[in-house]
C-alpha cells in the first residue's frame, strides 16, 4: 500500500511515516497543498491522509479539487480542528473519514486500512 501524508508538522509526520513503514506501508510526505498536488500528478496513491491547516492553503481546497475531478481516492482528514462543525464540513466536502489530533497511531492505521478495504470492494 502507498499513501500520501499531507502534513506540515515535521515531528508528527516523521512519527506517522515510521509507524506505517514498520507495517510495510510506503508513505510519501507532502508538507503543503502544492507539494501534494505535485506528488499526486506523478504517483497514484491508495489513500491520502490530509491536514486542513497547511502553510500554503487549506487541505479542504485540495479535497474539493480532488472530488471535483472525479478522484475517489480515500481521504482521511487528520487535523487539530476537531469540532463537530469541522468534521461535518470535511465529510460533506468529500472526506471519507476524520480523526482529530492528538490521536493514537493504531487508530489511524485501523481507519486507513478500513478505507482502503472499502475502496477495494467497490
List the predicted regions and their residue ranges.
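N-terminal/domain-start alpha-helical segments
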Residues: 1-122
